[in-house]
Amino acid sequence: MNQITVETTTIADVPIIIVAPEDAEGCPIVFHVHGFTGNKKAGVALGYRLAMEGMVCVCVDAYMHGDRLDPRLTALLDGSADYVYPRDTGLDIYFELHNIVKQTGDDVERLIDRFAGDPRVDTGRVGVTGYSMGGFTTYYTAAHNPRVQAAAALISFPALTERWEDVIAESSSYEKWADAIASVEAETAERTAFIRAMDPYAKLRDFYPRPLLMIQGDLDTDAPKFYTVKLYRELKPIYAEHPERLALHVYDHIAHQVTNPMRDDVSEWFKQHLLGKA
């Protein structure tokens, strides 16, 4: 049985947990990002699976999370922040999530640079994965970082601008919020522009021929499968010569949660596409 090491450290100002085979040398490296309000420990279960297969998994504390918890995020969550929108809409928190995604994706890029000199890993074989907010980060990183060679996004979606605009429209339909949202139209336009600039959706067309796995829960209302199915439909003809490198797994009777079969899917995906093992 392979011996696994677990190391908690900080690299490039990012708190991480490294889960690796004890004798790791030139292994693929997979970065894992947790969900909103979570922390790096959430990736350890998957990290063990990957390490047992011969990969190194780096579980990241997202920006403003875990060991770098930010009081600005705490204020948004506990009601003490200065909100742009009515607090009950959740729109300020939802917007901040996009900033966290971008900053964390940029952190992953810096981590790849720092791991380039680590003999345990091969930064020519980089994977990225995560769930919920971490799934958004996965899409963002895959779309914007050409060094990512394989990606697996769980219970999330790639269409950040479309979803933001849909949520704004839905919130505006409530009479009790309509006037307040209308009064900050300029701020909404600025926030929409920020999200549009980072949105991975269109850029994911250029991810081909690199492998992309998308996992959804059929009953998930936090991350509706609609947006992911739409991307899958658009990418299928692009991946026509290598259909095995694109996959959408929708789990019946599953809402916004990560299950062990999902983790198994991710492990198999990276085993196949980073290690070259069927």
Language-model features: locations:
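Short beta-strand element of the alpha/beta-hydrolase
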Residues: 26-35
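Conserved alpha/beta-hydrolase
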Residues: 50-87
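Primarily recognizes the serine-hydrolase "nucleophile elbow" in alpha/beta-hydrolase
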Residues: 106-171
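The feature captures the conserved acid-bearing segment of alpha/beta-hydrolase catalytic domains
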Residues: 162-227, 232-233
